[in-house]
């Protein structure tokens, strides 16, 4: 896991999952920061 800060702000404790080596993650920004997510969830972008 890697701690990442979303470019649009918001930072909750926790870590975003890593993308396994040799693979590509689905790159979609569907949130605007941790504050836009339900309580206890993080906004992660790979």
Curated annotation (Swiss-Prot):
It comes from the Eukaryota. Residues 12-46 form the WAP domain. GO terms for molecular function: serine-type endopeptidase inhibitor activity. The keyword Ligase does not apply. Keywords: Antibiotic, Antimicrobial, Protease inhibitor. GO terms for biological process: antibacterial humoral response; innate immune response. One of its GO terms (cellular component) is extracellular space. Has antibiotic activity against several equine uterine pathogens; S.zooepidemicus, E.coli and P.aeruginosa. Highly efficient against S.zoopedemicus. Not active against K.pneumoniae. Selectively inactivates microbial serine proteases (subtilisin A and proteinase K) without inhibiting mammalian serine proteases (human neutrophil elastase, human cathepsin G and bovine pancreatic trypsin). This is Antimicrobial peptide eNAP-2. It comes from Equus caballus (Horse).
